């Protein structure tokens, strides 16, 4: 029963996430979904006509229709500019070195990088965000909690020669904030 509930919840979240990016997602895009997790977001993208490559540091999918490439979390096993779009959907704060994962996403993307991240605006919200993330992911030990503020994420994007073309704040459970970022490569 709990497993069915989690799958249903993941399916609903995947549909919601697709809606956040659909305006900037050309049809039939070649996409890499980095940190695919349950696989439901990759599945929604595939069902909408995109060519999706799913990668993660371990296979945590809850669907037989998605099989991620398991990689070391440091270097993606793809050439430069292999994908139209790299997607990092609520994954960077799970990484011990989010800057490296982000740079790899930019390296393998021809043009766009989509990011959805939990952000905080003060110390209380930082710790509440950490607690809620641990609870939602059932990860209470070994979670790096490398969340950043909006300004810190946006500084990382600039340092990597990316232009912010769309930003939208989304409230979660009324008090938490996620930010949608659509980024494009620019010449350094």
Residue ranges of predicted features:
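Hydrophobic adenine-recognition pocket in adenosine-nucleotide-binding enzymes
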Residues: 91
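Class I SAM-dependent methyltransferase SAM/SAH-binding core
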Residues: 32, 38-75
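C-terminal alpha-helical "lid/dimerization" subdomain adjacent to the S-adenosyl-L-methionine
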Residues: 21, 43, 116-160, 165-173
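Core SAM-dependent methyltransferase catalytic element
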Residues: 169-188
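A conserved beta-strand element that flanks and buttresses the S-adenosyl-L-methionine
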Residues: 87
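Class I SAM-dependent transferase core
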Residues: 1-7
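Conserved alpha-helix/loop element of class I SAM-dependent methyltransferases that forms part
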Residues: 10-28
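A short glycine-rich, Lys/Arg-flanked "PGG" loop and its adjoining helix->strand segment in the class I
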Residues: 99-113
């Amino acid at each position: 029963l709990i497993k069915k509930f989690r799958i249903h919840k993941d399916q609903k979240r995947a549909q919601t996430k697709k809606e956040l990016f659909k305006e900037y997602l050309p049809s039939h895009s070649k996409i890499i979904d980095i940190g695919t997790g349950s696989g439901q977001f990759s599945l929604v993208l595939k069902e909408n006509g995109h060519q999706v490559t799913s990668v993660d540091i371990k296979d945590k999918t809850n669907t037989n229709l998605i099989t991620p490439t398991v990689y070391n979390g440091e270097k993606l096993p793809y050439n430069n500019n292999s994908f139209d779009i790299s997607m990092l959907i609520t994954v960077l704060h799970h990484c011990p070195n989010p800057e490296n994962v982000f740079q790899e996403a930019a390296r393998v993307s021809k043009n766009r990088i989509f990011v959805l991240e939990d952000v905080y605006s003060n110390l209380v919200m930082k710790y509440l965000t950490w607690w809620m993330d641990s609870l939602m992911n059932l990860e209470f030990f070994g979670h790096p909690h490398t969340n950043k503020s909006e300004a810190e994420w946006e500084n990382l994007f600039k340092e990597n020669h990316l232009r912010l073309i769309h930003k939208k704040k989304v409230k979660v459970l009324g008090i938490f904030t996620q930010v949608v970022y659509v980024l494009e490569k620019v010449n350094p």
